[in-house]
Amino acid sequence: MEEIDYHWKCQLMGHEVWVEPLSIIYHKGAVTLPVSSPKKTYLNYRNSFILLLTNYRASISLRLFFPRFFMECISLVKEILTFKWGHAFSIVRSWVWIMGHLGVLKKRR
């Protein structure tokens, strides 16, 4: 997510972000954590919320917060209905982390 955050911030500062469609990037995704890992779920949910809260002005973040939270609630219900308790707990844990670190995130804006 670091590269997403970097490019997002560059674009918000007025720089152009380009893509080279013919390029090939070899990326070892999920090497340290498998896709099925609840820890990976936790990190993905937490980090994507961090990007939302730190890369937009407060007014835009607030406007996007509720639709985003609603979608995450749907994901939580799906995990519960499919008995993926570790993933369900990871989603809730990411929310708790965000709520506990709002002051830190505000300073990162």
Regions found by a protein language model. Give the residues of each.
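Active-site-adjacent helix/loop segment of glycosyltransferases
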Residues: 16-106
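A short, conserved alpha-helix in the catalytic core of glycosyltransferases
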Residues: 1-24
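Short, intrinsically disordered, charge-balanced linker/junction segments flanking boundaries
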Residues: 1, 107-109
